[in-house]
Design a protein with these regions (language model features):
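Terminal helix-turn-helix DNA-binding modules in bacterial transcription factors
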Residues: 5-10, 15-19, 38-84, 99-105
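The DNA-contacting recognition helix of HTH DNA-binding domains
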Residues: 29-30, 34, 78-80
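Non-catalytic C-terminal interaction regions
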Residues: 88-92, 98-100
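Helix-turn-helix
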Residues: 22-27
Length: 105
């Protein structure tokens, strides 16, 4: 699992598919999916999206870059899906997060 975590951290801004990660690890795609979900409790794609959203969260706080620029930098091109997942994870919108962060400085 450590190898998978490292791979996702290093490549989160790139397109990561089940095919390329399972191939990289020399595993069958279906076996990889089952193994990952059994160990992590979530699907591999959900995990990749969480890693991306965590990186985006940090950039929203520590940079003044535009939201779309940040999301694309970290491999998230579907803005509607990003906003939905971000709000589920952090219970606020990216703009609200920035406002809160700027008020606490």
């Amino acid at each position: 699992m450590e190898q998978i975590y490292h791979y996702v951290e290093e490549h989160h801004s790139e397109e990561i598919t089940l095919e390329n990660i399972s191939s990289e690890l020399g595993l069958n795609r279906e076996y990889f999916c089952r193994m990952f979900k059994k160990n992590m409790g979530i699907s591999f794609i959900s995990y990749v999206n969480q890693v991306r959203i965590d990186h985006i969260y940090r950039d929203l706080i520590y940079t003044d870059d535009g939201i779309q620029e940040i999301t694309e930098r970290h491999g998230f091109y579907n803005q509607k899906l990003f906003y939905k997942m971000f709000k589920e994870r952090y219970q606020c919108t990216p703009l609200k997060l920035r406002k809160i962060a700027s008020e606490t400085e």
